[in-house]
């Protein structure tokens, strides 16, 4: 029984790690990483800083998904974030949820 439990935990960890990599790939293919980095500020804020700022807020996922699709200005400084209408609504939600895990 112990071996089965350990195996299940290990498989879950690998699956979750794979999801994180898939979401990072989505961030790259969507153009997010042209201006953002996970850990450090580039043109835009670090994704982990965004995740930390909005963590625990009721509408954080929907709010961030909206910013991903529609862009924003005067939120993180003078450089506006351009809209990214090419990102589908469902992918914007996946990206927002991914960012919220990076606190």
Regions found by a protein language model. Name each.
Residues 2-21:
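Classic N-terminal secretory signal peptides
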């Amino acid at each position: 029984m112990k071996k089965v439990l350990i195996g299940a935990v290990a498989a879950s960890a690998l699956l979750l790690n794979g999801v994180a990599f898939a979401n990072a790939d989505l961030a790259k293919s969507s153009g997010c990483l042209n201006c953002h980095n996970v850990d450090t500020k580039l043109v835009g804020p670090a994704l982990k800083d965004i995740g930390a700022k909005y963590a625990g807020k009721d509408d954080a996922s929907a709010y961030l998904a909206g910013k991903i699709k529609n862009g924003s200005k005067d939120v993180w400084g003078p450089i506006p974030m351009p809209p990214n209408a090419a990102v589908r609504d469902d992918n914007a939600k996946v990206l927002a949820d991914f960012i919220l895990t990076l606190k």
